A protein has these predicted regions:
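Rossmann-like dinucleotide-binding cores of NAD(P)H-dependent redox enzymes
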Residues: 1-23, 107, 127-133, 140
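Mid-to-C-terminal Rossmann-like scaffold of FAD/NAD(P)H-dependent oxidoreductases
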Residues: 87-186
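C-terminal auxiliary extensions adjacent to catalytic cores
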Residues: 161-220
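A general beta-strand register signal
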Residues: 14, 32-33, 134, 170
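Generic secondary-structure signature for well-ordered alpha-helical cores
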Residues: 3, 7, 11-12, 62, ...
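Well-ordered beta-strand scaffold positions
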Residues: 18, 36-37, 138, 174
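FAD-site-proximal beta/loop scaffold in flavoenzymes
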Residues: 26-32, 37-113
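Short, surface-exposed charged micro-motifs
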Residues: 21, 73, 167
Length: 221
């Protein structure tokens, strides 16, 4: 769906190849692709994801994984040392798994929790992470853990006539994450379903129906 939007807006996607060489003098003039194609250009952007600099901590004794290991209070393995931000690989008690979140909203929230811990007000970091983006008129949102890992169920709510789709990730009968395109009205509901740990077993056929109201998944009092 995203590729279709890009191509409709005159963005050319080169599939199954990659850049082998950037050429030019003091300024970039273009690139060569591995398939032999030459592309003239004025600018090159390299997107490789996030790399967490932990090399300098390897001799410190602090527990490291992909980032700095922490518990739900953002305490590291060393007493009176806290972590926060992109580097924090913490115990998420909402999703019941280890998480690492690279956005400003989490960095700010984690900074507050770490600061509270430093002044003796030990507080659990409990937040369902989300972020949004947009481009060429499409609205895109991510909430919770959006990875379709082994053992998880992935279901889709597709409405082609509205150019919208929601991919929902389910683990242990609970929704743990979702990716939304042009269906942002459901983001708040999905966030609360994740936070409340609502079980959705037996409701998959209803969930994939784009007309089904997700609010009805909440238990009635």
């Amino acid at each position: 769906m995203i590729e279709n939007t890009l191509e409709k807006n005159n963005v050319t996607i080169k599939r199954q190849t990659e850049v082998s060489e950037v050429f030019g003098g003091e300024e970039v003039a273009g690139v060569f692709l591995k398939n032999g194609e030459k592309l003239d250009c004025d600018m090159v952007f390299a997107m490789i994801g996030v790399v967490y600099p932990t090399e300098w901590l390897k001799q410190s004794g602090i527990s490291l994984g992909r980032g700095i290991i922490a518990n739900e209070f953002l305490e590291t393995s060393i007493s009176d040392v806290w972590t926060a931000g992109d580097i924090a690989e913490y115990n998420d008690t909402v999703l019941n798994e280890t998480m690492q979140c690279g956005n400003w909203m989490n960095s700010r929230g984690q900074g507050e929790i770490a600061a509270l811990g430093m002044v003796g007000k030990r507080t659990e970091y409990k937040m369902v992470t989300f972020q949004t983006s947009h481009g060429f008129g499409d609205l895109i949102g991510f909430v919770g853990d959006t990875r379709p890992a082994l053992g998880r169920t992935v279901v889709y709510r597709v409405a082609p006539e509205k150019n919208s789709i929601v991919r929902i990730i389910i683990s242990e009968e609970k929704i743990i994450g979702a990716t939304l395109i042009n269906r942002m009205a459901e983001m708040g509901t999905i966030t609360k379903l994740i936070k409340d740990g609502v079980k959705v077993s037996g409701m998959l056929e209803s969930i994939i129906n784009p007309e089904f109201d997700l609010k009805t998944l909440f238990p009635t009092v």
